[in-house]
Amino acid sequence: GVGLARIEFVLTAQVGIHPLALAFYDQLTDFSRHGFVAPSLKPYEERLRSEDPHELATLLGAVERRTPGYTDQRAFFVDQLKFGVGLICAAFHPRPVLVRLSDLKSNEYRDLLGGRLFEPVEENPMIAWRGASRYADPGFRQAFAMECEALRFVYQEMGLDNLQLMIPFCRTPEEGRAVVEVLTREGLGPSQGIPLFLQKATDRPGQELRGMPGVGIGEEEKGTVRLLKTLMAGPGLS
């Protein structure tokens, strides 16, 4: 099987566009043309209004060129991800393929096309808004919903039941529990038959979540470098 397939490789190599720039493409286009800020873009209004209009139009044109044949740019993200993950799962079926959910750092998301509109500038992205902390966050909900849609297609529509999932960079039991709840709502939880693993960033989550009925964390893995950086609050981008 595959010990660890990382979704971020598909995001950077095959997609290359910030997921929210795709999810909100139509709303961004309306803003660029008419100055109208849709409710979904309200959290980003200050950044949008500080953006040079010509640069924003150029950015949206680049997104359109990267998604030829798509009238719904959101579907481009889902297609790239489901075919990328599906290809790996199909190649190794029935052997298990462990897929780690997206774990780009904020500076890496900013490097994607449109990323500067949606990502904060963080002093230490290595231990900041990443991994599990994003998935249940309202500011990333639309992006993670697309990720889940693609993975659900792989498991349900493609019938690749060797798919397994890993939650990366989980810092607290509450964080892990919230992510499990989101995955379950999206049809990707342990109750739907998908093995779920935990990559913890501190010593707390695995021990406490493992003993909770219904949470369904199957296994845990320490990211040793990340654990050290988190505990020491050490700087670093890699």
Predicted regions and their residues:
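Conserved alpha/beta-domain cores
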Residues: 1-238
